[in-house]
Amino acid sequence: MAEPRRKKRPSKLQDTLVYGLVWLACFAPLAWLAWRGYAGELGANPIDKLIRELGEWGLRLLLVGLAITPAARILKMPRLVRFRRTVGLFAFAYVALHLLAYVGIDLFFDWNQLWKDILKRPFITLGMLGFMLLIPLAVTSTNGWVIRMGRAAWSRLHRLVYLIVPLGVAHYYLLVKADHRPPIIYGAVFVALMLWRVWEGRRTASKSSP
């Protein structure tokens, strides 16, 4: 009887190329935004446009990170899960740049004004809370932290993303004055991803039960 043929594992070169494509895809929006800023194509209010697009890309990448596990399960491509860390770190970078642009360009590092905004403007309060919760996730994203904390504790900490994303959606919704469709769409995507997780969890539990 012939032995079953083993699946050929991707080579290191293939892995490197895929990682390179993921990095390029995550970095491309920032490069395009920088070019548009240099070319004066950010509209009548370039500062607001810059701040908003950085934040929106941060939110998009957070949602992409949450979508990787469902995509890996549905497409039967478990190796996709390896890219969650890279996507998550890029999401943090975009959110950090969003905050830096707001504090540095819009407020000229006026910390007193920032504190007033946090206390008096709900969308700033929610956005700052979401960013503060993102920091420990970015810091503990390495394998070393998984070992130090233990897989269970590390996983519990990183479930904060399930709070961070709705905070980001609410921040965006309260920020916009006219077209609320984008934050509503992002919120709907988040709800769909959470419903999939509930369904998948119940399906897995029913399979494991006697």
Curated annotation (Swiss-Prot):
Subcellular localization(s) per the UniProt record: Cell inner membrane
Domain of life assignment: Bacteria
Transmembrane segments: 15-35, 89-109, 122-142, 160-180
Disulfide bonds: none
GO-annotated cellular components: plasma membrane
Source organism (scientific name): Caulobacter vibrioides (strain ATCC 19089 / CIP 103742 / CB 15) (Caulobacter crescentus)
Family: Belongs to the MsrQ family.
Name the UniProt record assigns to this protein: Protein-methionine-sulfoxide reductase heme-binding subunit MsrQ
Alphabetized PANTHER family for the sequence: PROTEIN-METHIONINE-SULFOXIDE REDUCTASE HEME-BINDING SUBUNIT MSRQ
Described function: Part of the MsrPQ system that repairs oxidized periplasmic proteins containing methionine sulfoxide residues (Met-O), using respiratory chain electrons. Thus protects these proteins from oxidative-stress damage caused by reactive species of oxygen and chlorine generated by the host defense mechanisms. MsrPQ is essential for the maintenance of envelope integrity under bleach stress, rescuing a wide series of structurally unrelated periplasmic proteins from methionine oxidation.
Keyword entries, A-Z: Cell inner membrane, Cell membrane, Electron transport, Flavoprotein, FMN, Heme, Iron, Membrane, Metal-binding, Transmembrane, Transmembrane helix, Transport
Protein topology in the membrane: Multi-pass membrane protein
InterPro entries to which the protein is assigned, alphabetical: Fe3_Rdtase_TM_dom (IPR013130), MsrQ-like (IPR022837)
